[in-house]
Structure formats: structure tokens, C-alpha cells
Design a protein with these regions (language model features):
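N-terminal secretory signal peptides that target proteins for export/translocation
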Residues: 1-5
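Bacterial N-terminal signal peptides
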Residues: 10-20
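Sec/Tat signal peptide C-region and signal peptidase I cleavage site
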Residues: 21-25
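Structured extracytoplasmic
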Residues: 26-170, 177-184, 188-199, 207-215, ...
Length: 279
């Protein structure tokens, strides 16, 4: 979120995030895991994450994103609302068709925010950048019927925003101890700058087709604190729905302007999802 482009300011607190994911393996008697076990678990769930991302390339889905700036008392003073359908090509390139995008009354949404909407917020980790992260095992949690490994994740080196546009995840992930797949994430994208701050986003996944856990709901509600002491209260809700197996013959589409997808094949009915338990 870009402070300079927002007219109304409010007061507040900053954010501290963290903790991260985890996955498989047996626990030692004290809830501890050996480093070898941790390494095996991380390797297992990151490999599953790569498989999941490849599987997602065979699906189309809908994203309904609402980002609001809030004033005193929590009233909405600005809004960015964008509804889109997405499909991917064989190389994993994303194509977007915008179906609803009224003129935003909140002008603080940056290119980094849009990048995170399609990357870090729903997916957290890029499976091809796993070696860029530190993984710290934080224990196990039980949410409803799921037993979950929990890991805190942080980049080994934070990208320099003056030299690169690369974004990395910092936060926590929850991994099912049976399937060794991520079912929940909580964190944000970095780096941040003096004028660009990002909220901590909590994302839940649901199981589709009895195999992969796809993101279905992301939420954030936070007061962002900037270097000069000014604050901005942000609320974000993103819903991902209508997952359906599909393959589209597409031409390049401008994600910002929302061109039409070409020759998109008919989409069969999506498999019934299994909700992620919420604490």
C-alpha cells in the first residue's frame, strides 16, 4: 500500500507477522523434531507444493478481491474491488479476464499489492525458490480433525527493492501431517519501503478432487505504520472460487486492463471442495 497516494490517514499500530509452515514426519517425545526429520518434512511439502502449482495450471478459477481503506470507527473511506477469471498456459503463465472493476475510490493499491494478490497472498511460497528460505519448526497444532505441523519461514536474504522487483514471503504455514500439504498460511510479502507497507494476510485452503489444497479465502485487517509515523488502516478480503479443470488456447492479455481471453474451452463442473477447518 502506498501512503503517498492515500488521502486520509489514521493512527495505529504496526504489524509483526510470523511463523511458518510445516509438514510430515514423526515427532520425538517432547514434541521436538530432529534436523533430519525437519529437512525431510520440508522437502516433502515443498515438493507437494510444486505438484500443486503444476496442477493449478490445469484449472480455471474466479477471484473476487476487495481492498478497503478504513477511517475512524472503522467506516470505509475508499475501496478497490476487482473480480476476474484466471487461466494458465502450459508454462504456468497467468491470464486474466476482468468481469467487474468499478473506478476505485481507494488509490493506494500498488503494483506490488497486485503482484501479491496473484502470488504470495494465496500461495506464500514459490516452490522454485525454496532454497532462498529458512525454515524453523514451531510445533504441532490440531484444528478440528487435522493435525498440523507449523513452521516459521523467513528469507535468508531480503531482496533490495532498489535493485529488484522480486517478492519473498515471511510468515507461517500449517501443513497436514498425513498428506504433507500446506492447508493454511499467514504472512506477507517483502521487501517493504518507506512509502510501501503490506498487511499480514491469512489464507485458508480447501481440498479439491481429494488431492490438492487450493486457496479459497484470504483476509487481512491491519493498520500499516509508515516510516514518518503516519498510519493507514487496511482491510482486505479475497475469495477464490469456481475452480474447474480447463485448458485454454490463449493470447497474451493485459492483466491491468483486462482484455478478453481467446478460444477458452468450456469448463466442466468443478469437484466439490473440502473446507479447511478454522480455529
Amino acid at each position: 500500500m502506498n501512503f503517498r497516494r492515500v488521502a486520509v490517514l489514521v493512527t495505529a499500530l504496526s504489524i509483526l507477522v510470523l511463523a511458518a509452515p510445516l509438514a510430515l514426519a514423526q515427532q520425538n517425545s517432547g514434541g521436538e523434531l530432529s534436523q533430519a526429520e525437519i529437512n525431510r518434512i520440508v522437502a516433502a511439502f515443498t515438493a507437494k507444493e510444486a505438484q500443486f502449482r503444476q496442477a493449478l495450471n490445469q484449472y480455471s478459477f474466479k477471484r473476487d478481491a476487495v481492498i478497503q481503506s478504513l477511517g475512524m470507527g472503522g467506516q470505509v473511506i475508499g475501496e478497490y474491488h476487482r473480480v476476474s477469471s484466471f487461466t494458465f498456459d502450459d508454462q504456468g503463465n497467468r491470464f486474466e479476464k476482468i468481469s467487474f472493476f468499478p473506478m476505485p475510490s481507494f488509490g493506494g493499491v500498488t503494483n506490488e499489492d497486485l503482484d501479491d494478490l496473484g502470488g504470495i497472498n494465496p500461495f506464500a511460497l514459490d516452490p522454485y525458490k525454496i532454497d532462498r528460505y529458512n525454515f524453523k519448526y514451531s510445533g504441532k497444532e490440531k484444528i478440528d480433525e487435522l493435525n498440523l505441523y507449523v513452521f516459521d519461514i523467513s528469507p535468508k536474504v531480503i531482496p533490495d527493492p532498489k535493485k529488484t522487483k522480486e517478492r519473498l514471503f515471511i510468515g507461517r504455514v500449517w501443513v497436514d501431517d498425513q498428506e504433507l500439504q500446506i492447508v493454511k498460511t499467514k504472512g506477507k510479502g517483502i521487501p517493504e519501503t518507506k512509502i510501501n507497507r503490506f498487511p499480514v494476510v491469512e489464507t485458508y485452503r480447501e481440498q479439491f478432487g481429494g488431492r490438492f489444497w487450493f486457496p479459497t479465502y484470504s483476509y487481512a485487517d491491519e493498520e500499516l505504520v509508515f516510516e514518518n509515523g503516519s498510519t493507514l488502516h487496511i482491510r482486505m478480503q479475497v475469495r477464490y472460487s469456481d475452480f474447474a479443470p480447463a485448458r485454454a488456447d490463449v493470447k497474451v492479455v493485459d492483466v491491468e486492463t483486462g482484455g478478453e481471453l481467446q478460444n477458452e474451452k468450456a469448463k466442466p463442473e468443478a469437484p466439490k471442495p473440502t473446507p479447511t477447518p478454522k480455529p
